[in-house]
């Protein structure tokens, strides 16, 4: 059954799954078609367990050979790693460095003093400064992306609020989840399928955690490259990848 929602909130519901507006349900990768079936949940907070959330919303929908993908932000939120802006006091260095970060419509990243401050704390001042220097050299050569290659996944996963962020996270900085492989394994044991923790946005992404070393992370980056969970107020922090 398909049901339409009015205006910018229009989505299509097929059974218990959601295909978010502007996203395709299926994608072809290396000659194989995959469904990306998003799952709507309540607003997750640090009072929730990601395992309990997955058991409640995803487990009843899982079929054989499915893979559950979970956004890293919601895992971090469950771990208490959504830090209120009011609790972050950026140092002068954070304010200075944030001015050189490219702002995009897909997320503020480290382009605000508070997110850069958290990058300095999470990754270390020396490493961030080294990454910034390498990035500046890369830009002279016409190359982008060198900063995150040096700073690493912890820095890449940090994000700040934007106009469409769901409260209370519209006033928080989101940090990378701790121990994503272990989290993926714990969820997998609870729901009975492969699980990955993703850091995907409308510019690309990474797989931060996987429940098995046999999972092809590069393949799932291709399958999820158009960010089917969305980048706005969709409230779909997890989904199922299923071979058609």
Regions found by a protein language model. Name each.
Residues 9-244:
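N-terminal and secondary-structure boundary signal
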């Amino acid at each position: 059954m398909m049901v339409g929602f009015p205006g910018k909130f229009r989505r299509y519901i097929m059974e218990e799954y959601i295909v978010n507006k502007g996203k395709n349900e299926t994608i072809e990768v290396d000659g194989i078609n995959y469904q990306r079936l998003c799952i709507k949940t309540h607003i997750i907070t640090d009072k929730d367990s990601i395992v309990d959330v997955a058991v409640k919303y995803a487990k009843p929908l899982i079929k054989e050979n499915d893979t559950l993908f979970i956004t890293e932000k919601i895992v971090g939120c469950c771990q208490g790693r959504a830090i209120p802006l009011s609790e972050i006091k950026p140092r002068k260095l954070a304010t200075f460095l944030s001015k050189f970060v490219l702002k995009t419509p897909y997320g503020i990243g480290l382009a605000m003093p508070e997110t850069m401050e958290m990058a300095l704390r999470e990754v270390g001042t020396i490493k961030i400064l080294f990454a910034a220097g390498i990035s500046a050299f890369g830009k002279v050569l016409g190359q982008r992306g060198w900063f995150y290659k040096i700073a690493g996944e912890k820095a890449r996963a940090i994000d700040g609020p934007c106009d469409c962020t769901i409260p209370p996270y519209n006033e928080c900085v989101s940090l990378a989840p701790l121990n994503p492989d272990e989290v993926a394994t714990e969820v997998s044991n609870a729901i009975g399928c492969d699980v990955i923790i993703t850091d995907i946005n409308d510019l690309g992404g990474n797989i931060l955690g996987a429940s098995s070393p046999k999972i092809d992370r590069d393949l799932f980056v291709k399958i999820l490259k158009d960010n089917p969970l969305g980048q706005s107020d969709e409230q779909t922090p997890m989904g199922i990848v299923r071979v058609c």
